[in-house]
């Protein structure tokens, strides 16, 4: 694992969580989702080239990914259903629940279905789809010449631009969680190792002693795109996917090309605290809604009874400050008591 890629992944997870609890200034956090899929495709392409694809290898790869995705989803869903039942807000729609349990809800274009129950679980459904497609893509796509890969991406990108043009918020959100749309992010990530190999042959790229300059350029490009997103309503139809492709691709490439020679930004992203949070990243992302419920229904009332209101502070307004440490604590507990024991049981052989 490239530490800086993990660090950026955690950084975006934390910002997404803050956006979900009401920080509207972070409404561009779709860039984080784009990064997740691109970095996943990139790392898989580095580790699993699948030059020789056979049924046994595919089944082993797919089964391992299925076992990593479904148990955490079912565990989180059970927690959510239990909490909703205790609060008296539980409403069961059998079809919707069935689609959610099987992670097929992301294929629906209906808002109440793809955002049902644990709202972020659509991400797992799309990620699993990308995982299941990966061996086939790796076998047929990765061996292509770079120019042929870029032609494929250009065609897919043009299709995405045309499809998204003129979309309203409802239809754009449906496409935002639709697996084939996110597969483009994933495929871009799969292409980047080839781009990096070519970049390394150039006289300038990747040759400096450390990556400070390259990191600053990548962050500047990403920041400029964020500012364009906020100030130019004309880009809104493509604000969930297309406009982030180049900035995030550049960021991932810099992380890879300067792995082991990080500048100050890279060293921050590779720092031990972020890497430690990276060990519970999946749990943190999935449990963010549970953490919000725990705070709003348990901790905030307790803080109110302890006299926080007399200090002029509304306990409920502190959720954006408390969600991160509480979420990390819950993620660590679930990782220690559920994920790790289950992984030892499933993957010990």
Regions found by a protein language model. Give the residues of each.
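Hydrophobic alpha-helical segments with transmembrane-like composition
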Residues: 105-162, 177-179, 183, 193, ...
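Aromatic-anchored segments of alpha-helical transmembrane domains
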Residues: 13-21, 102-107, 154-167, 219-231, ...
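Interfacial loop-to-helix transition and helix-capping segments at the boundaries
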Residues: 2-3, 23-33, 112-126, 166-188, ...
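Functionally critical transmembrane alpha-helices in membrane proteins and complexes, commonly lining
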Residues: 2-50, 67-77, 99-105, 247-250, ...
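Generic alpha-helical transmembrane segments of integral inner-membrane proteins
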Residues: 14, 39, 74, 78-82, ...
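Membrane-interface junctions at the ends of membrane-embedded or membrane-associated helices
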Residues: 1, 49-56, 60, 139-147, ...
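Alpha-helical transmembrane segments of multi-pass integral membrane proteins
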Residues: 186, 217-340
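Transmembrane alpha-helical segments and their boundary/interface "anchor" motifs
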Residues: 5, 49-85, 91-103, 125-130, ...
């Amino acid at each position: 694992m490239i530490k800086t890629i993990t660090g950026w992944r955690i950084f975006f997870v934390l910002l997404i969580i803050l956006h979900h609890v009401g920080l509207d200034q972070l409404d561009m956090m779709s860039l984080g989702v784009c990064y997740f899929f691109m970095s996943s495709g990139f790392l898989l392409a580095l580790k699993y080239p699948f030059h020789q694809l056979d049924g046994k290898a595919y089944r082993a790869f797919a089964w391992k990914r299925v076992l990593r995705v479904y148990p955490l989803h079912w565990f989180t869903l059970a927690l959510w259903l239990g909490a909703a039942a205790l609060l008296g807000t539980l409403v069961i729609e059998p079809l919707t629940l069935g689609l959610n349990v099987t992670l097929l809800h992301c294929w629906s274009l209906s808002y109440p279905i793809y955002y049902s129950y644990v709202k972020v679980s659509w991400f797992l459904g799309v990620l699993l789809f990308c995982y299941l497609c990966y061996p086939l893509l790796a076998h047929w796509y990765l061996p292509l010449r770079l120019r042929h890969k870029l032609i494929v991406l250009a065609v897919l990108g043009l299709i995405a631009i045309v499809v998204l043009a003129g979309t309203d918020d409802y239809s754009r959100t449906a496409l935002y969680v639709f697996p084939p749309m996110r597969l483009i992010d994933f495929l871009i990530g799969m292409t980047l190792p080839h781009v990096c190999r070519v970049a390394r042959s150039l006289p300038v790229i990747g040759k400096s002693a450390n990556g400070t300059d390259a990191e600053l350029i990548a962050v500047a490009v990403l920041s400029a795109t964020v500012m364009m997103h906020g100030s130019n309503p004309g880009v809104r139809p493509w604000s969930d996917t297309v406009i982030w492709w180049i900035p995030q691709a550049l960021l991932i490439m810099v992380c890879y090309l300067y792995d082991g020679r990080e500048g100050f930004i890279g060293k921050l992203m590779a720092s031990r605290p972020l890497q430690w949070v990276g060990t519970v990243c999946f749990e943190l992302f999935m449990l963010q809604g549970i953490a919000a419920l725990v705070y709003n229904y348990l901790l905030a009332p307790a803080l109110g009874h302890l006299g926080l209101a007399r200090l002029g502070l509304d306990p409920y307004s502190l959720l954006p400050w408390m969600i991160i440490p509480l979420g990390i604590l819950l993620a660590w507990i679930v990782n220690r008591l559920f994920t790790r024991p289950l992984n030892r049981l499933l993957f010990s052989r």
